[in-house]
Amino acid sequence: GLLLFPTATKKLRRMWAFPSILLLSIVMIFSTXLSIQQINSSSIYQYVWSWTXDNDFSLEFGYLIDPLTSIMSMLXTTVGIMVLIYSDNYMAHDQGYLIFFAYMSFFSTSMLGLVTSSNLIQIYIFWELVGMCSYLLIGFWFTRPSAANACQKAFVTNRVGDFGLLLGILGFYWITGSFEFQDLFEIFNNLIYNNQVNSPFVTLCAALLFAGAVAKSAQFPLHVWLPDAMEGPTPISALIHAATMVAAGIFLVARLLPLFIVIPYIMNFISLIGIITVLLGATLALAQKDIKRGLAYSTMSQLXYMMLALGMGSYRSALFHLITHAYSKALLFLGSGSVIHSMETIVGYSPDKSQNMVLMGGLRKHVPITKTSFLLGTLSLCGIPPLACFWSKDEILNESWLYSPIFAIIAWATAGLTAFYMFRIYLLTFEGHLNVHFQNYSGNQNASLYSISLWGKGCSKRINKNFLLLKMNNNESSSFFSKNTYRSDENVRKRNRGRPFINIVDFYNQKSFSYPYESDNTMLFPLLVLVLFTLFVGILGIPFNQEGRDLDILSKWLAPSINLLHQKSEDSTDWYEFLKNAIFSVSIASFGIFLASXLYKPIYSSFKNFDLINLFVKTGPKRSRWDKIINILYXWSYXRAYIDTFYTTSXTGAIRGLAQLTDFFDRRVIDGITNGVGVMSFFV
């Protein structure tokens, strides 16, 4: 009986996943019914009851059901259900299985409470609960120092934004005397119309409110917690990046847009932060080796597209991209979890190895379903039609030209970067050969190695056979394909007076290898469902409103909110303009995919790329300058733009120095005075 007890309890505890999934499914059914009602009737529901009442002060609690609420509740429930089903298998062997599901359910509940809130105080309460849940889940494996540090970093960074949010809430209560959204918007618009507000103070309060969204949605400069949040289990990474925590910041700005839209400086500030984050997130994703961190920086960049759209006043485009990105990014994160799960059969439980794209490659032969779903998510994020993100991102890109040509150029260029780094992740993970069998990561002298020195792929220091391909002058600077920490044997380099542009290194070994395998059905089912969303959810926002037929579902859904913002929906779509812009955006994305394929496609399986690469590779002083530029870009990307280093040396270092000074003052000065008085009294 004692021998069978652990097996029996494991099966019993997995039963507790069912109530969580069932309850969230019931909420999803209610959310779907509310969404259908709103599409048909364009209505807004609000119910409020008094929590505390006084002569001069009253605090109400209630719920507000409008298009924004129904969209966010649909996202949170549909993605949440898929993540919970996926987690049942992913976390089955974890000792904290039950507490993980408790945290996940509480996380979903907090997010649903946040999106249904009818006033700022209620939003702030659930805002803090969402932050607390993220702290618990990011640090779920708290015995690992990296996870413990990551959850503390996320908590402290979000406290900065939350403090600004609290001050902004109090500031607007001081101005309007109300926390309720409907009253707040009406009173504030009247004050603006009658010119009865202090513009600098109002702008400051609005900026403080926006600071909360900057921290929660990982916008520059409070984005530093997001890549470290990947230390948590992969299912929670999917939930945070798709439908809960980072979406909360976008939700807050969208909810308060009627307030921000009458303060021009704030709208400009929101769009500026958005465009900076768009470019920064894309450049930081270029050289990441951890598959989840690469996707995290992708999330940061895509959230900035939404923030840019909100700053431009394009409410519909921002929410459309929020919907399409949520399903595509959930698919990518759950797909990466399936990859990590399969890699653990070879490297064991070691995030440094199982998440490292250096050791991946060739997985398409072993995990074909995961590969196909990941490829569809990648194509969607790249903006390839007819997948979901193509429709929403194109809308933002087109509207950016009307707002600012400079912002538009950056946004369009970043679309090409997005295609480049996403296909880099895909190619390093699924194409070529399984590099874990050719990497000497275990320290064995007989380990096989068959590697290409690329961004994201290393070259051994021990070389038996060195095929020199595409030789170039031996300069101190390394090439685009290599980082100077990945060096060939020095004697080989001196003997050949050149560094190989591509090193192919081969070791022979009689050892038999194990191979990854496809995940179980409970992990594949959510992937297939999210594939369907990725394929078809874009239909919601396609502007089919020609010849008197209005089939634009998203515009009908958002009609009450758009009317509140005093915006007009376009009656018809200029299909010539649409096709022209679509062809341009797809061309940019295709160019990014082409570059990624040329640089990261496995060379050892196709030597046809050499002639193409030779067109771009020439020796001489110009090549040396190009290598320096590439090294600077690599160091910028891999070192996270040095922002973490700056915070560590300036903010963290200053706080620690102040703490040490305070400790010295307490021990030496305060205690010294006390002890001195005691000694003096002894002599007296």
Curated annotation (Swiss-Prot):
Keywords: Chloroplast, Membrane, NAD, NADP, Plastid, Plastoquinone, Quinone, Thylakoid, Translocase, Transmembrane, Transmembrane helix, Transport. Its EC number is 7.1.1.-. Pfam families: Proton_antipo_C, Proton_antipo_M, Proton_antipo_N. The chain crosses the membrane at residues 16-36, 65-85, 96-116, 123-143, 161-181, 206-226, 234-254, 256-276, 303-323, 330-350, 372-392, 401-421, 524-544, 583-603. It is an enzyme of class 7 (translocase). It catalyses: a plastoquinone + NADH + (n+1) H(+)(in) = a plastoquinol + NAD(+) + n H(+)(out); a plastoquinone + NADPH + (n+1) H(+)(in) = a plastoquinol + NADP(+) + n H(+)(out). GO terms for biological process: ATP synthesis coupled electron transport; electron transport coupled proton transport. GO terms for molecular function: NADH dehydrogenase (ubiquinone) activity; quinone binding. One of its GO terms (cellular component) is chloroplast thylakoid membrane. It is found in: Plastid, Chloroplast thylakoid membrane. InterPro entries: NADH_UbQ_OxRdtase_chlpt_su5_C, NADHpl_OxRdtase_5_subgr, ND/Mrp_TM, NU5C-like, Proton_antipo_N. It is a multi-pass membrane protein. NDH is composed of at least 16 different subunits, 5 of which are encoded in the nucleus. Belongs to the complex I subunit 5 family. NCBIfam families: NDH_I_L (TIGR01974), PRK06590.1 (NF005141). NDH shuttles electrons from NAD(P)H:plastoquinone, via FMN and iron-sulfur (Fe-S) centers, to quinones in the photosynthetic chain and possibly in a chloroplast respiratory chain. The immediate electron acceptor for the enzyme in this species is believed to be plastoquinone. Couples the redox reaction to proton translocation, and thus conserves the redox energy in a proton gradient. This is NAD(P)H-quinone oxidoreductase subunit 5, chloroplastic. It comes from Sesamum indicum (Oriental sesame). The lineage of its organism: Eukaryota, Viridiplantae, Streptophyta, Embryophyta, Tracheophyta.
